[in-house]
């Protein structure tokens, strides 16, 4: 439905669609009246297969899309963002800067992007997240946790809630008019100014 707000979760390579983090963050999203979709990507060995599955769900039909990814799921969300142009990208323990993924640091295509990473991540070095955040000028939250971030789940949930609220405020403040309407108003204002502008005698 065109008026829906939907959060799409993408789980990690070794986890499932309703792991501990996703369950907790899904509650946060539902409390803010987002519908939650968490596909099962466990049958896909290829990251590209996961991206294609996400795109096949036609998320662009929703009014407001937030993509949330964990580990490999962050890479999937980043790759899908180029076509979907979501309002938000919320990336946990992102699989970026890894040699076995191509592209290894996909560009984020979203109005708002935020990374959360553990200082003690044993799978994706924290330097990878820092470099990604620096290269694409996106905010990064570093927490005292490992790759799973479970020990900091309360903090992750609070960060996610603030992120969704910012996305909602951004949507509320957006100008709902079409480009044609904006151009017509600008044209009208220009003509009005020209009409009331006093003529300078020669």
Cite the ranges covered by each PLM segment.
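Conserved alpha/beta-hydrolase "acid-adjacent" motif
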Residues: 18, 122-128
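Short beta-strand/loop motif that positions the catalytic acidic residue
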Residues: 109, 114-117, 121
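Acidic beta-to-alpha connecting loop that harbors the catalytic carboxylate
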Residues: 13, 119-121, 145-146
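Post-His helix in hydrolase/transferase enzymes
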Residues: 150-166
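Short, surface-exposed "cap/lid" segments of acyl-processing enzymes
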Residues: 2-44, 196
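Catalytic histidine neighborhood in serine/cysteine hydrolases
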Residues: 134-150
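Gly/Ala-rich beta-loop-alpha elbow adjacent to hydrolase catalytic centers
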Residues: 68-77
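A conserved short beta-strand
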Residues: 85-97
């Amino acid at each position: 439905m065109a008026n829906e707000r939907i959060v799409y979760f993408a789980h990690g390579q070794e986890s499932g669609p309703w792991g501990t983090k996703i369950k907790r963050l899904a509650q946060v999203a539902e409390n803010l009246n987002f519908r939650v979709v968490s596909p099962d990507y466990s049958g896909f060995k290829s990251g590209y297969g996961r991206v294609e599955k996400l795109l096949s769900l036609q998320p662009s039909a929703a009014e407001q899309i937030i993509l949330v990814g964990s580990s490999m799921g962050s890479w999937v969300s980043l790759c899908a963002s180029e076509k979907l142009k979501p309002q938000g990208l919320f990336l946990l323990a992102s699989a970026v800067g890894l040699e076995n993924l191509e592209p290894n640091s996909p560009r984020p295509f979203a109005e708002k992007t935020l990374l959360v990473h553990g200082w003690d991540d044993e799978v994706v070095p924290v330097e990878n997240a820092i470099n990604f955040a620096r290269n694409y000028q996106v905010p990064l939250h570093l927490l005292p946790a490992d790759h799973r971030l479970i020990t900091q789940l309360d903090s992750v949930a609070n960060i996610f809630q603030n992120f969704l609220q910012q996305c909602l405020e951004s949507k509320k403040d957006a100008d709902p008019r079409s480009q044609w309407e904006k151009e017509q108003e600008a044209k009208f204002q220009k003509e009005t100014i020209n009409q009331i502008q006093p003529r300078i005698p020669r």
